[in-house]
């Protein structure tokens, strides 16, 4: 009885034994793994070199001439603004402006670059809401050849925020889909939901700056043919500068 049990156990152990892999197959598998590791390393190095190469951009002589011309033009224009400001009068019925950057700023003066940065328009075809004040109007005059701006209505404000509204929370960009996030960051200003946020932007109050800075700049949609036919696309958009209430048409076009 004992011998039969022992025999059965030995048979089961033999069945459970892991089958041995032939030595030549192990060598092939090891060589294949080494080859894959080498290929992965080479691909990583090539990717790093490609990233390094992207930083090296050679400028043509025409680009330097164009940048020099832009800087001279900016200097003359800004000097004229200092001598004869011709500031726009503050409108009685409008307290909110929407500014869209529609031109590249390569080679422009440092003052223009700094003003663009203050307006948070670092990317082309991005837009921000700005409260209409003498100081902000002066900033808009400085960057006038590179942006277009006007007075949005409540419908445009609502559509922009509902479709493209985003906020930066803990260095992460998140869509405005949760009222809890809005209440957590803007509740101290009496803003607890998306409708409150839209109202505070459309009708600027004393906390407009804090609320508008909670919003990320709006990255507007550009037609597919814009990259191929930039001149034609800019003609469709219109010229830079002030356009009053016609900014609502542009918002609907790019939203």
Swiss-Prot record:
Record's keyword annotation contains Hydrolase: no
Modified residues (Phosphoserine): 63
Annotated NCBIfam families: uL30_euk
Superkingdom of origin: Eukaryota
Matching PROSITE patterns: RIBOSOMAL_L30 (PS00634)
Gene3D superfamilies per UniProt: Ribosomal protein L30, ferredoxin-like fold domain
Pfam families: Ribosomal_L30, Ribosomal_L30_N
Organism ancestry: Eukaryota, Metazoa, Chordata, Craniata, Vertebrata
Name used for this protein in its record: Ribosomal protein uL30-like
Record's GO cellular component terms: cytosolic large ribosomal subunit; mitochondrion; nucleolus
Family as reported in the entry's similarity comment: Belongs to the universal ribosomal protein uL30 family.
Signal sequence extent: none
GO biological process, alphabetically ordered: blastocyst formation; maturation of LSU-rRNA from tricistronic rRNA transcript (SSU-rRNA, 5.8S rRNA, LSU-rRNA)
Parts forming coiled coils: none
GO terms assigned for molecular function: RNA binding; structural constituent of ribosome
Keywords assigned: Phosphoprotein, Ribonucleoprotein, Ribosomal protein
Encoding gene (name): RPL7L1
InterPro entries, alphabetized: Ribo_uL30_ferredoxin-like_sf (IPR036919), Ribosomal_uL30 (IPR039699), Ribosomal_uL30_CS (IPR018038), Ribosomal_uL30_euk (IPR005998), Ribosomal_uL30_euk_arc (IPR035808), Ribosomal_uL30_ferredoxin-like (IPR016082), Ribosomal_uL30_N_euk (IPR012988)
């Amino acid at each position: 009885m004992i011998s039969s049990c022992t025999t059965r156990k030995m048979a089961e152990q033999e069945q459970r034994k892991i089958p041995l892999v032939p030595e030549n197959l192990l060598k092939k598998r090891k060589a294949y793994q080494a080859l894959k590791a080498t290929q992965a390393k080479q691909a990583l190095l090539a990717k790093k070199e490609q990233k390094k190469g992207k930083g090296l951009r050679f400028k043509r002589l025409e680009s330097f001439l164009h940048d020099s011309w832009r800087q001279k033009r900016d200097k003359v224009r800004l000097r004229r603004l200092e001598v004869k400001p011709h500031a726009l009068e503050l409108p009685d019925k409008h307290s909110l402006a929407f500014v869209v950057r529609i031109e590249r700023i390569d080679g422009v003066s440092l003052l223009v670059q700094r003003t663009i940065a203050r307006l948070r328009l670092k990317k082309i075809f991005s837009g921000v809401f700005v409260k209409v004040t003498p100081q902000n109007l002066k900033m808009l005059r400085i960057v006038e050849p590179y942006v277009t701006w006007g007075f949005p209505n409540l419908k445009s404000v609502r559509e922009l925020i509902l479709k493209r509204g985003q906020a930066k929370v803990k260095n992460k960009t998140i869509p405005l889909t949760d009222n809890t996030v809005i209440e957590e960051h803007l509740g101290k200003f009496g803003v607890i939901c998306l409708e409150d946020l839209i109202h505070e932007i459309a009708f600027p109050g004393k906390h407009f700056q804090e609320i508008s800075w909670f919003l990320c700049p709006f990255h507007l949609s550009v037609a597919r043919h814009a990259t191929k036919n930039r001149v034609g696309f800019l003609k469709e958009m219109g010229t830079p500068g002030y356009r009053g209430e016609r900014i609502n048409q542009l918002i609907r076009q790019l939203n």
